[in-house]
């Protein structure tokens, strides 16, 4: 008997040492991955056999403070907000207070869309499977993109609507319902859809893709589609609850839902994919400078979630998942996510630190000035150039786009990107010439020709049904590129450039009678019209009445 006890103790010791070795290996690998991708920090939890197996919090909260993250540091959950909310919806379904297939208008009249009779068809099931027909976010008045229940169309607006229904059924704010139903029962003490004062001392700052910290959003109202603040410590508790809840797994089973493509369907609150390791539920999160990813294997009670404070956070999803699961991931292909080691990301990141010609040199064909298109596609180079252009690194963008034209001299997309770069530099003539080339190569899109005319101050053809409106912006004499964007041009901040005329930036547009919202965009900065006293107090959009 003593020998047996010693053997058992020895086996337990070996198992423990193996787990420690795996953990150390994973920690080293995670640090390498985020460093290579230019990500300040990652918070990750790995669930196995229905319980928390490993957790990692490594990196820094801010590029400036260098303060390390820990297991209580709060991150933005982005669209993981939807998955957590879906669990609370399930609780209402289980208590028979909500029927997934009963039209929502019978619970609550949603005034934002009630003018369209199709809103009477929408159910909770449609919203949870992203088949409500609503857009992701409204641009002005909320309108249906598609008929309800017919096809997949990712929609945050749908979740906002469903949260109003939940508030009507429960008689309390959705944040209070989430606290009572999910957060407090699961001891998720660092989770809320509204910013809490106790978060002030320990939260991660968001960072751009070139590792610059940006302003943190502190949500004052609950948005169940996007505003959840949490971390891997709390989210692991949520995942453990879901993976061990047989009723939830049967109610929200993985073999139902609406198809996204042949390998992926969307079930209630999660995407579903079939992998070589088994069926998964997944959800990604993208709030710009916070990125997250969650995946579970319900049949194995296994899963992983990670949070990052970087615009590059989803670029590491493939590398992170490989550390824990030896499986294909169709969802990552569908989301078009590369590895952190992918040439597209490495050229971009290295080009921030050195001349971009040197960064791309390893990917040129030997002895030539042409790109190895197996490693870097035409669209990849355009994507990198566009990211540089957004940062104001115009010379880097032009270098890449001109190199792309060596490989693809008839690439309309390259000319379009080149035209926009020249435009933002303030080189009107070069930009107009380039936009004309883009139009000549691809007449499927007529906006390049329209934009070339606007840049050269050639007026649009007169439309007698519309009224000519002249907008002026005084000052900003040193600006390179000024435009006006609004509800009249789908908030496109490039299509309506302004010209410096007699001491002010000026443009003329033709509009039908109605009410419009707009802003000026000065070298990428959106501003309210200082001459117009009529503006929206929430968005600060200037309001234009055309009679």
Where are the language model's segments positioned?
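N-terminal leader/targeting segments and the immediately adjacent pre-domain N-terminus
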Residues: 3-12, 18-75, 91-99, 129, ...
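Active-site helix/loop module of the DD-peptidase/beta-lactamase fold
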Residues: 23, 76-80, 92-135, 169-211
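Catalytic loop of the DD-peptidase/beta-lactamase superfamily, centered on the K-T-G motif
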Residues: 24-57, 167-172, 176-180, 184, ...
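Short active-site loop at a secondary-structure junction
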Residues: 33-43, 64-126, 144-157, 223-226, ...
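Alpha-helical scaffold elements that line and support the substrate/ligand-binding pocket
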Residues: 44-46, 50-51, 76-99, 103, ...
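Catalytic-site signature segments of enzymes, centered on catalytic residues
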Residues: 74, 129-202, 216, 221-236
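Aromatic-rich carbohydrate-binding modules that target alpha-glucans
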Residues: 460-515, 521-547
């Amino acid at each position: 008997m003593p020998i047996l006890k010693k053997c058992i103790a020895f086996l337990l010791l070996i198992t423990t040492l193996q787990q420690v070795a795996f953990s150390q290996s994973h920690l080293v690998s995670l640090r390498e991955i985020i460093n290579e991708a230019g990500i300040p920090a990652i918070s990750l939890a790995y669930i196995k056999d229905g319980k928390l197996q490993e957790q990692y919090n490594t990196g820094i909260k801010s590029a400036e403070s260098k303060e390390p993250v820990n297991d209580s540091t709060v991150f933005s959950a982005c669209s993981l907000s939807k998955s957590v909310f879906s669990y609370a919806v399930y609780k209402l379904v289980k208590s028979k207070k909500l029927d997934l297939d009963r039209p929502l208008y019978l619970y609550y009249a949603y005034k934002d869309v009630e003018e369209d009779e199709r809103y009477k068809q929408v159910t909770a099931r449609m919203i949870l499977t992203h088949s409500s027909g609503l857009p992701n976010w409204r641009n002005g008045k909320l309108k249906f993109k598609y008929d309800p229940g017919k096809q997949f169309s990712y929609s945050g607006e749908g979740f906002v609507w469903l949260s109003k229904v939940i508030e009507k059924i429960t008689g309390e704010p959705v944040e209070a319902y989430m606290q009572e139903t999910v957060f407090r029962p699961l001891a998720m003490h660092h989770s809320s859809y509204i910013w809490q004062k106790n978060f002030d001392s320990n939260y991660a700052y968001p960072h751009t893709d070139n590792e610059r910290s940006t302003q943190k959003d502190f949500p004052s109202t609950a948005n169940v589609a996007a505003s959840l603040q949490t971390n891997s410590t709390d989210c692991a508790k949520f995942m453990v609850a879901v993976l061990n809840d047989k009723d939830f797994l049967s109610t929200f089973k993985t073999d139902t839902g609406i198809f996204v493509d042949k390998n992926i369907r969307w079930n209630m609150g999660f995407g579903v994919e079939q992998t070589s390791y088994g069926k998964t539920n997944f959800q990604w999160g993208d709030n710009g400078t916070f990125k997250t990813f969650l995946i579970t294997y319900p049949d194995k009670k296994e899963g992983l979630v990670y949070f990052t404070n970087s615009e590059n956070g989803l670029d590491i999803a493939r590398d992170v998942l490989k550390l824990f699961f030896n499986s294909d991931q169709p969802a990552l292909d569908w989301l078009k996510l590369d590895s952190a080691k992918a040439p597209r990301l490495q050229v971009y990141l290295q080009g921030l630190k050195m001349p971009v010609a040197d960064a791309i040199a390893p990917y040129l064909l030997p002895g030539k000035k042409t790109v190895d298109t197996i490693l870097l596609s035409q669209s990849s180079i355009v994507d990198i150039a566009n990211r540089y252009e957004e940062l104001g690194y115009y010379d880097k963008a032009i270098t890449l786009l001109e190199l792309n034209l060596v490989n693809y001299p008839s690439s309309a997309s390259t000319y379009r990107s080149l035209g926009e770069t020249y435009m933002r530099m303030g080189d009107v003539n070069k930009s107009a010439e380039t936009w004309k080339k883009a139009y000549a190569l691809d007449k499927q899109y007529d906006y390049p020709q329209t934009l070339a005319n606007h840049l050269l101050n050639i007026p649009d053809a007169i439309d007698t049904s519309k009224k000519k409106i002249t907008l002026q912006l005084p000052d900003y004499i040193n600006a390179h590129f000024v435009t006006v964007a609004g509800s009249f041009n789908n908030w496109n901040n490039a299509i309506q450039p302004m010209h410096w005329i007699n001491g002010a930036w000026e443009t003329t547009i033709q509009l039908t009678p109605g009410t419009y919202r707009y802003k000026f965009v000065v070298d990428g900065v959106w501003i309210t019209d200082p001459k117009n006293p009529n503006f929206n107090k929430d968005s600060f959009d200037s309001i234009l009445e055309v009679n």
